[in-house]
Design a protein with these regions (language model features):
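NAD(P)-dependent dehydrogenase/reductase Rossmann-like domain
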Residues: 2-263
């Protein structure tokens, strides 16, 4: 929670500076290559910037050898007409989230797109109209990474891309889709994703392993394709589990694969 609040404060400061600049008729972040976004759009999209950055950060950590990425696609689902949805700020934050974990440079709204191009990463966007409240600028954001291997096979969609999706709920970013599995976990702290056989006792087993090492579980969600078949367990943890804990999780017979993700 503390880390998320610190990040949100940093984003808030950056947005506030951009809003002040926009009110003066300046570009966002007062730089030529930063997203030029009107103040009213900045204000409306503020709750979504953390979601956008977190989804990008999660997606790149699912790649086996993240520096090999060449193509990413962002899908914005909204009740609004695509021409009425300004996504430049969200695109910049997603790009920042993808690039920062695999870059030695400091990444911000100004240099994110430039750094992505230097690394040969092409980012495309699609706006999809859905039946949702038009008062919300964005219903959900989906990030897809193409032509890469995944550390977590269950994050791969039917089309062969790494695919994750999220929403803002009550002002908090949530992960709602991993590959073809539906989940619902707050994107705060760190995250463990496990693919398992859907059977009783799995939550308790993993929780006990983490508890033995004094790792606090902040939330947990299970999504499955069918009863008693494969399921995805998403576990939020406040601390980073040590190697011993992660090894024990991998040794649970019903767990077929898992991945630890830093937020």
């Amino acid at each position: 929670m503390i880390a998320c609040h610190i990040f949100q404060e940093g984003v808030a400061i950056e947005i506030a500076e951009a809003v002040v600049g926009a009110l003066k008729g300046e570009l966002a972040a007062t730089a030529v290559n930063a997203p030029m976004v009107p103040a009213e759009v900045l204000s409306e999209l503020a709750p979504y910037v953390v979601l956008a950055e977190r989804l990008g950060r999660l997606a790149v950590q699912l790649v086996a050898g993240g520096s090999g990425m060449k193509s990413a696609k962002v899908v914005y689902k909204s009740a609004r007409d695509p021409d009425d949805l300004d996504t430049r700020l969200l695109r910049a934050m997603i790009t920042k989230g993808i690039i920062e974990p695999i870059s030695d440079s400091f990444i911000n709204l100004v240099n994110a797109d430039f750094t992505a191009k230097k690394k040969g990463l092409r980012i495309s966007e699609e706006r999809v109209v859905v039946d949702a409240s038009p008062e919300l600028p964005v219903f959900s954001i989906q990030v897809q990474l193409s032509n890469v291997d995944s550390k977590f096979g269950s994050a791969v969609s039917g089309g062969g891309d790494i695919s994750i999706e999220g929403k803002v709920k009550n002002g908090i970013p949530h992960l709602t889709q991993v590959g073809s599995f539906s989940v619902d976990v707050s994107l705060e702290g760190n995250l463990i994703l496990c693919r398992q056989v859907d059977q009783p006792g799995m939550i308790g087993q993993v929780g006990n392993i983490l508890g033995e090492q004094n790792v606090n579980v902040s939330f947990m969600s299970v999504g499955r394709t069918a009863r008693r078949r494969n399921a995805i367990m998403a576990i939020g943890v406040d601390e980073e589990p040590n190697l011993e804990s992660l090894k024990k999780i991998g040794e649970v017979p019903a767990i077929e694969e898992f991945v630890f993700l830093k937020l």
